[in-house]
Amino acid sequence: MKEIRIENLHFRIGAKEILRGITANLPADRFVALLGPNGCGKSTLLKHLYRVHPIQEGSVVMDDTPIAQIPLRAAAQEIGVMGQFHAVDFDFSAEEIVLMGRAPYKESFEEDTAADFALVRTALERVGMADAAQRSFNELSGGEQQRVMLARCLVQEPQLLILDEPTNHLDIKYQLHILELVKGLGIGVIAALHDLNLAAMYADLLVVMKEGRIDRIGTPQEIITVDMLAHIYGVRANVTYDAAGLPLVDYRTEQLP
């Protein structure tokens, strides 16, 4: 998968318009971060990419195929998704949750294999949850559940990861660990993020949304500016640059002239 083309995408709930004519060509083989204040439409846009929301108006095309025409099993083999909420009705262990990521490769009633369990062990190790394999998923903390759900994505062996606020509930150690991990997979990532400095560190391309529209798209150096912070977030801040030329947002406004 190389490209996702979104054209004139609208979405409404009742009389409220959530997405207002989204148009963008997004690389599906790089790390793309969606930015913007709460309620701007980031999660809703992502849910169109992984087909939770049907398309009401406009189009979403992955490479040359409209997403509605991609068979669900094929889509699940290509795209791994980690949403914001992880409610589980039954008492599954962490290992069982991760094993579900192999479902797109299974026929009905096909048993899990030794190779499947090996993938699960490796994935849990990569997210720092190997010792929790037999623990109840529902008894894990929010951050631990996040890491287990990412492990489930990893065993899908997808070409694209869609992550909705993947650093929620994580302490800074695991925020950095998870983003470093997904960055190093060598596959496409589209992630909604709130931390602008983390987005600048890990994303190749930033997509900034405001009030259901895409306001601007560019590299971290192009996007993270004093003017953008004021326009999108309504805050005064200073922007400096590290040794690699990446922007760093400093919210201590008393330093501003």
Model-derived segments and spans:
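Conserved ABC transporter NBD signature motif
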Residues: 58-66, 75
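ABC ATPase nucleotide-binding domains
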Residues: 231-257
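Catalytic Walker B motif of ABC-type/P-loop ATPase nucleotide-binding domains
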Residues: 161-165
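Helix-to-loop junction immediately C-terminal to a conserved catalytic motif
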Residues: 50
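The feature captures the beta-strand-to-loop junction immediately N-terminal to the Walker
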Residues: 35-37
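Conserved ABC ATPase "signature" region
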Residues: 99, 114-132
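A short, proline-enriched helix->beta-strand linker immediately N-terminal to the Walker B motif
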Residues: 155-159
